[in-house]
From Swiss-Prot:
Function text: Possibly involved in the regulation of flight muscles contraction, possibly by modulating actin-myosin interaction.
Protein name (Swiss-Prot/TrEMBL): Flightin
GO MF entries: structural constituent of muscle; structural molecule activity conferring elasticity
Originating gene: fln
Cysteine-cysteine disulfides: none
Annotated source species: Drosophila melanogaster
Residue span of region Disordered: 1-76
Length: 182
């Protein structure tokens, strides 16, 4: 891709000019700036010689530039996606099952038939009333019967008795507080 022009490239010259300008004779950057050099005892005096005299021969050696990165041709291996997806049919809660049946069943049926190759009409959106009627249109075997239990009656009486004092005092407080308005 070196001979092709990069449509997304915003630089004028490219990497070749940058590499040529760095190798053409620009000095290598120093390892430490003079203002950053530390004055520790170990750095400043080693066997009676100052640190600046010792560091001078090390800076004479040129630091080699890192090799240029390999040329990127822009090709990325495509991600392999599996075309066949088995839709999970297990639903944990009965409420979620009823909601799915009520709301999404037409669309799911359309997708299932389309995957098997059967032509089917595209489902139209339902009104709220249609969805409610579909939910309540349950066969006799699926009806959950409710038989009032003795425990339910006891809980209702206990709750009513425990909240009675709260209701009384709240009503008394409101009447007293807002007597001038009422």
């Amino acid at each position: 891709m070196a001979d092709e022009e990069d449509p997304w490239g915003f630089d004028d010259g490219g990497e070749e000019e940058k590499a040529a300008s760095t190798q053409a004779g620009t000095p290598a950057p120093p390892s430490k700036a003079p203002s950053v050099a530390s004055d520790h005892k170990a750095d400043s005096v080693v066997a009676g010689t100052p640190a600046n005299e010792e560091a001078a021969p090390e800076e004479v050696e040129e630091i080699k530039a890192p090799p240029p990165p390999p040329e990127d041709d822009g090709y990325r291996k495509p991600v392999q996606l599996y075309r066949h997806w088995v839709r999970p049919k297990f639903l944990q809660y009965k409420y979620m099952y009823n909601y799915r049946t009520n709301y999404y069943d037409d669309v799911i049926d359309y997708i299932d038939k389309k995957q098997t190759g059967v032509a089917r009409e595209i489902p139209r959106p339902q009104t709220w009333a249609e969805r409610v009627l579909r939910t309540r249109n349950i066969s006799g075997s699926d009806i959950d019967s409710y038989a009032p239990a003795k425990r339910d009656k006891q809980l209702i009486q206990t709750l009513a008795a425990s909240i009675r004092t709260y209701n009384y005092h709240t009503k008394a407080y409101i009447n007293q507080r807002y007597a001038s308005v009422l």
